[in-house]
Amino acid sequence: MIPKKIIIMAGGSGGHVFPGLTIARYLIEKGWLVNWIGTKNSIESRIIPTYGIKIHYISIKGLRNTSLKNLIISPIYILRAYYAVKKIIKTWSPDIVLGMGGYVSGPGGVASWNCNIPLLLHEQNKIAGITNKWLSRISTKNMQASPGVLRNAEVVGNPVCQSIIKVPNPINRFKNRTGLLRVLVIGGSQGSSILNRILPKVSFLLKEKIIFWHQTGNYELEKTKKKYNKLRLNQNLITSFIKNIASAYEWADLIICRSGALTVSEISIVGLGAIFIPYPHKDKQQHRNAEDLELIGAAKIIDQSNLNTKLIVNILNSLDRDKLFIMAKKAHSLGVRDAIFNIFNVINKISKKT
């Protein structure tokens, strides 16, 4: 039997890459051949090859907050990327092309449509990105994590890796847990400067109450470590990137983080109370992602413009492990744990028509 082939397009941020990687790994288990399209010097270039997946690099940049110069020359990059992906499609002949959103998906989405290859889209956020909005007009099938985001889209949830789904539920995690409150700090796959600046001060003021596991991102690891060391806070674990995020979720009583779609989905699946500091996008997509958890009392949302040391300290002082256990159970009630199966069913169904 000839194996099916798929090209997955995702890059720029963990929010696009990791859901795509979860889909890729599941498809490989099912006997599919997978190629990837991304950009050099982004997270996908460091992550995807380690899983034995062939990645093709295109030169393309996002247009959000870009300079006037880049905006003027962007059509040249888009055309080059389009022809590069078209050549890959002609050479490899995939059965399906899957776009996970973000600027990487744009040229490839148009190329797959032009080559009459079924184009599938997946939107992770509660507000669709520009690329997915445009491509949804020409795509074969649209998928979305939440209702009402893309036109004529099937609700499938956000795919997360099995290690996260297998994290023990809040009842088992919190049972007999004692000691300092365990706070996981994650500013997204690339870290967050504002969290790296504020959280060491918070740790100093609450060193008798909490312990941090802090993901800083690659660029600010040493600077953030120095802040903690200067305050003689040696009990905290400071790292640039947490590869085994499931173990971190299992360890934590609470998470302080951005509210990217994948992070919110993972927190719901695991069941973990959260303090969200949404990245201040103009469309407030991260704020929207977190609203359901705040509404049921599983999370608190702080706009970045209001964030300061005193506010975080006051919130943490108002919490104890019993309250965090209640927040965790509420979060757990919203978890969508069958997204990968839903997505595979859609992909498999479309592939049988080719």
Curated annotation (Swiss-Prot):
The keyword Glycosyltransferase applies. It is found in: Cell inner membrane. UDP-N-acetyl-alpha-D-glucosamine binds at residues 13-15, 125, 189, 242, 261-266, 286. One of its GO terms (cellular component) is plasma membrane. It is a peripheral membrane protein. GO terms for biological process: carbohydrate metabolic process; cell division; cell wall organization; lipid glycosylation; peptidoglycan biosynthetic process; regulation of cell shape. It is an enzyme of class 2 (transferase). Its main location: membrane. It catalyses: di-trans,octa-cis-undecaprenyl diphospho-N-acetyl-alpha-D-muramoyl-L-alanyl-D-glutamyl-meso-2,6-diaminopimeloyl-D-alanyl-D-alanine + UDP-N-acetyl-alpha-D-glucosamine = di-trans,octa-cis-undecaprenyl diphospho-[N-acetyl-alpha-D-glucosaminyl-(1->4)]-N-acetyl-alpha-D-muramoyl-L-alanyl-D-glutamyl-meso-2,6-diaminopimeloyl-D-alanyl-D-alanine + UDP + H(+). HAMAP family: MurG (MF_00033). This is UDP-N-acetylglucosamine--N-acetylmuramyl-(pentapeptide) pyrophosphoryl-undecaprenol N-acetylglucosamine transferase. It comes from Buchnera aphidicola subsp. Acyrthosiphon pisum (strain 5A).
